[in-house]
Each structure stands twice: as structure tokens, then as C-alpha cells.
């Protein structure tokens, strides 16, 4: 690998926004490292390599501290640097608040917020030593507006946005930028699963629930994962060199309504 080649770690890389982001960074010349609990993430890395890029997949549960530490160390030892961290991995919980179990609360918090914490914790020593780096956390429109049956998902996303702002100030002396991106509805397996749960719970046809969600976007459609991956790359680029502590709503006007 060229000593000038930059390295990006993307979590939740097996599908959806994470897979699209991994491909975009590889297209821009990065060594694109994907982490996901799903083994299918290997397919994304293989596709990148077949197209002449540099992709690597490591199976990882972002809520498992030992495994996160191992994966970050492996990347750091192999490449000698970590330039970008995209904290994308997460889960959604769709359930009335008073029906949420303590175990569901812990799982949602551990993966969504805990995963961000662990990746930041173990990547930061590399970025501090380099005196450079970019962290992009995954917020959500749910961190800005209230949604019925999405209390825990929204709570974790709101916490991620708050963590982003505080961490941006803490890491500024090390020339490390920290931002979050908050998508609206994106056509991913997670969103389709969310719609299916709501459809089943309310006995409403899937297509009707889907159309209601699409109506929340100004363009009356869901985003393609690439439409989130490209803004993520911009936040990591030199074009965003004066941007830190920001949350970028890529929600097709949802919150502006």
C-alpha cells in the first residue's frame, strides 16, 4: 500500500448505507475497511477488490469491546494509520414505550450508542498520534423529531448527536473533526424491516405504510443509500475542512416542514 493512501473504517458495511459508503471511499482511493456482524460484508470487500480498489472486511459486533479492540488494532497494525471512522452500525426498535423490555433497551443502547463509543475510543489513539482524522457518526431524523413507537431509537440517535458535538470540541486540539449525519427515510433492509413491523402491528398493508413514510419526504420518495454515502464522503474530505461539531440533516426537508 502506498504510504499516502488513506484508510477508512466503516461499520455496518454489509448492506445499505454502510455498503454504499464503503464503495464510495474505495472509489476515492481509500483503503476501505468494513466492519459488520453479518458475514455478507465480505461480498462488498470482494466487489471493491474486483473493481481495482482496496477493500477489507472484518466480522465484528460493535457492542463487543474485545472484538472492536482487536479489529481496530489489526487495521492500525496493517496500515499504520486510520484517517476516517464512519460509525454507521445500528439497529431500530419499533414498539410502544411501555412494552419495551429492559433487555431490548440495553441491546438498542449498546449497539447504537455503545458501538459509537467503542469505535471512537479505540480509533482515537491513532488519530491523536497522527494529529489528524475525521469521525462521522450516524444520527437520524429520529434524533430531531418525535416518532410514535420509536422512543428508544430516537433517544440513542439524539445521544449520538450530543456526543458528536462534545467530542468535536474535545478533539479539536488534535486536528480531528467530528460530525454526524442524520438521514431521513433511506431504502435499506433496516427501513423495510421497520415498515414491516409497523405494518404487522397496525394491520396496515405494507405499501400503505411505505407511502405514508414517503410522503414525509419533500420529493415523495426514499433516498438511495448512495445519496447518504456521498454526503458522508464530503464530510470526510478537505472540502469540509472547516466543518466540525455539526449534524447534517439529509432528510429531504422532513424537519423543515
Language-model segments: residues:
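Conserved glycine-rich cofactor-binding loop
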Residues: 14-15
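Conserved glycine-rich Rossmann-like NAD(P)H-binding loop of the short-chain dehydrogenase/reductase
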Residues: 28-43
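Substrate-binding pocket helix/loop in short-chain dehydrogenase/reductase
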Residues: 96-97, 104-109, 213
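C-terminal substrate-recognition "lid" of short-chain dehydrogenase/reductases
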Residues: 117, 221-250, 255
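Active-site helix of classical SDR
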Residues: 120, 156, 164
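Alpha-helical segment proximal to the catalytic Tyr-Lys
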Residues: 125, 169-173, 241
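Residue(s) in the substrate-gating loop at a strand-loop-helix junction
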Residues: 140
Amino acid at each position: 500500500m502506498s504510504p499516502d493512501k488513506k484508510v477508512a473504517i466503516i461499520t455496518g458495511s454489509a448492506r445499505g448505507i454502510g455498503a454504499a459508503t464503503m464503495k464510495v471511499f474505495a472509489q476515492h482511493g481509500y483503503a476501505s475497511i468494513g466492519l459488520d456482524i453479518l458475514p455478507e460484508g465480505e461480498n462488498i470487500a470482494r466487489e471493491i477488490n474486483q473493481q481495482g480498489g482496496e477493500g477489507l472486511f472484518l466480522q465484528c459486533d460493535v457492542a463487543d469491546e474485545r472484538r472492536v479492540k482487536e479489529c481496530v488494532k489489526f487495521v492500525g497494525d496493517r496500515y499504520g494509520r486510520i484517517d476516517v471512522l464512519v460509525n454507521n452500525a445500528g439497529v431500530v426498535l419499533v414498539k410502544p414505550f411501555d412494552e419495551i423490555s429492559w433487555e431490548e433497551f440495553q441491546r438498542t443502547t449498546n449497539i447504537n450508542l455503545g458501538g459509537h463509543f467503542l469505535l471512537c475510543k479505540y480509533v482515537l489513539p491513532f488519530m491523536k498520534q497522527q494529529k489528524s482524522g475525521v469521525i462521522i457518526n450516524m444520527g437520524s431524523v429520529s434524533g430531531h423529531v418525535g416518532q410514535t413507537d420509536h422512543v428508544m431509537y430516537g433517544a440513542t440517535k439524539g445521544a449520538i448527536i450530543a456526543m458528536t458535538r462534545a467530542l468535536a470540541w474535545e478533539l479539536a486540539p488534535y486536528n480531528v473533526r467530528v460530525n454526524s449525519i442524520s438521514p431521513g427515510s433511506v431504502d435499506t433492509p433496516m427501513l423495510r424491516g421497520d415498515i414491516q413491523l409497523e405494518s404487522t402491528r397496525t394491520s396496515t398493508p405494507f405499501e400503505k405504510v411505505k407511502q405514508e413514510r414517503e410522503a414525509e419526504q419533500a420529493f415523495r420518495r426514499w433516498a438511495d443509500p448512495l445519496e447518504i454515502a456521498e454526503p458522508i464522503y464530503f464530510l470526510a474530505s478537505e472540502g469540509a475542512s472547516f466543518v466540525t461539531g455539526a449534524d447534517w440533516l439529509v432528510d429531504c426537508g422532513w424537519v423543515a416542514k
